[in-house]
Amino acid sequence: MVSSPPRPTALTDDIHAFGPARATIQGQPLSDSEVEAMDAFFRACNYLAVGMIYLLDNPLLKEPLKPEHIKKRLLGHWGSSPGLAFCYLHLNRIIKKYQQEVIFLAGPGHGAPGVLAPVYLEGSYSEIYPNISEDAAGLKKFFKQFSFPGGIGSHCTPETPGSIHEGGELGYVLSHACGAAFDNPDLIVAAVVGDGEAETAPLATSWHINKFLNPARDGAVLPILNLNGYKINNPTILARIPHQDLENYFRGLGYDPCFVEGSDRPSMHQAMAATLDYCVTRIKEIQRTAREEGLTTLPRWPMIVLRTPKGWTGPAEVNGHKVEGSWRAHQVPLADVHTNPENLQLLENWLRSYRPEELFDHNGTFRPDLKALAPTGNYRMGMNPHANGGLLRKDLKMPNFREYGITFDKPGQIEVENTRPLGVFLRDVMRNNPRNFRIFGPDETTSNKLNAVYEASKKFWIAESFDEDADGGELSPEGRVIEMLSEHTLEGMLEGYLLTGRHGFFSTYEAFVHVIDSMFNQHAKWLSICNELSWRADVSSLNLLITSTVWRQDHNGFTHQDPGFLDIVCNKSAKVTRIYLPPDVNSLLSVADHCLRSKNYVNVIVSDKQLHLQYLTMDQAIIHCTKGVGIWDWASNDQGYEPDLVMASAGDIPTQEALAAIALLRQEFPELKIRYINVVDLFKLQPETEHPHGLSDRDFDSLFTLDRPIIFNFHGYPWLIHRLAYRRHNHRNLHVRGYKEKGNINTPLELAINNEIDRFSLAIDAIDRLPELQVAGAHAKEKFRNMQIAARNYAYEYGVDKPEFSHWTWPF
């Protein structure tokens, strides 16, 4: 590991946030006038931050503050705002000094006033929102809209210029930053980590992003841990451990930690400027060495530990209680200003302490000499195109997916691992797009049968290597497959990669995709809002392959059996969510090609990796996937008739069992007219008024009939189908089978039997719902029950399914 050079230090064991600056890096790079100007910009940021939380009117305090000038409902988070603004304005200096591209991610996104303020002051906000002008009238609107109905949210939402990270749900800032830095060699991603955020599991793991950045081809992430000491009502852990332990912690993680601590503003400006000069210089040294001499060892990237008081520059005390430097600064330090004249005066004094009359002219325009501290054009962090990644996005150069399909003579006769041809297809997608496409997986790419991608690019690895790694390890410092056993970190990397204009693909085990439930939620919400913003350019969809599915987790057992992620996806906006359940290889390839070309969606593809029957030729698969739902004529015998029964399914295993049930019924009752319907696009079941992919009632009724019994065999939890189809005319005759939380170490057929998605249960269900078979079907039901019992007993004795069931083929 490359070590950092020895440096002088003025650090002590003091872990308090007050006093003159204490810093690892010594120096005074700023002149007195520069310190004064930097502090004036800082005062302006803090003034705006307080104004956003409190003010409805009187934005420049041209008259004494009155209750009617104050918002009726006070919302926002003051405590983190000064630290964020301090980082932002010092990064502006770095951008100008080094002509360096930087984007800014605020982990504690609830401190949005500290980000919105400098974005407004640099001019980016008014450029995107001309109605929020750079004068008193615009400032009044800017204050009013914050955390206000009809305005903007209280975090770094998609409406925030320069934001790719909302920071509402904490823990993802470093993984988002890493994704943004991938394949952006000239970019520094400044990622402010809140010390409360640092206690979350995703953040604690994501410190390891420094092992996944290649300085020869990637940009850099500069983590800035803001130790302001408190969460909502508790001290933070990292702010209360001994200084040496904290430094050792980050050194052990492979960083070069640079401390900047204190509250005295002039000395803090000097310390932060010197520290950022060191960090940028060090980053450039690491990158130059790797790009000129090759990457030989794991770099030790710099990071900053910024210890400042929570609510820095705010009221020291309120009503006899400490505020600045305590948890009371977290949200709204003065909450009763409408009714308490003393606190109203405190608020006015607080606002006037920033001396706004020195910062804005008589029209309310920010002083030009102070605005000049910020960069211009696209160097402004609010206008950097990397933070509006769709502006930089290029379509993938796609191979012809048809060339990766399989051929066969008859449907339902041969078995193929569904995901293996997909791996070959993805291999060539990666070959065609060596700088803007990556694959992510939590140690499962080979397990999920996608290992053909290693023919195009290995797994990225720059930590220590052993000789045995060469034997199938597939490791390389040039690799573009990212594997780490943290779904959180991988999902964050992918999101950051997509939001900065690139493309990606993530595969994971179905049961453990739940690890990123809430991350999916947040990303879907982000996309939903972006769709409403004309200035946000389209980004590539998040493509998620769910494999190692519930019905083939018979060997791992109950803990690995959970298809409920689909329920989570269905909770999100129909504008951004898509769910596909391709039943075989050719349909999976068609779906994958479609998803990789799409924009602004979360595409969830459910496909198992094991051997499965193949049903559709490539031409048939393309047509079927284009429609999303359809009758398989070769599996039906109702041609020219009203069907007696509709058998439907969604998912590979449910499809096999549904077809086997049809075969049982047709063998017992040759006159029975059965229509088989396969669903690839799950949202086809919803009405078109609820989802853009939904079928019209006319088309749904044409397929599923108005009054015939429907047996629907579903991959997931059965109630999801009822939820999607409850408005349909024939819902009363819809009977759904799916996973019912009945699992253990089973055989595949036994697991299906336990949850009643097996062929025997489906055939019995059909008989029970056909009045004409109530008498004639009794013997068949007994036969099917006997076969079911025999199948289970065989599994108990031999540990596998009977070959006639495990290698069943379509008999017609």
Swiss-Prot record:
NCBIfam families: PRK05261.1-2 (NF003617), PRK05261.1-4 (NF003619)
Pfam family, one: XFP
Family (UniProt): Belongs to the XFP family.
InterPro entries for this protein: Phosphoketolase, THDP-binding, Transketo_C/PFOR_II, Xul5P/Fru6P_PKetolase, Xul5P/Fru6P_PKetolase_C, Xul5P/Fru6P_PKetolase_CS, Xul5P/Fru6P_PKetolase_N, Xul5P/Fru6P_PKetolase_ThDP_BS
SUPFAM superfamilies reported for this sequence: Thiamin diphosphate-binding fold (THDP-binding)
Alphabetically ordered keywords of this record: Lyase, Thiamine pyrophosphate
Protein name: Probable phosphoketolase
UniProt keyword annotation of Cytoplasm present: no
Top-level taxon in the UniProt lineage: Bacteria
GO biological process, one term: carbohydrate metabolic process
EC identifiers of the protein: 4.1.2.-
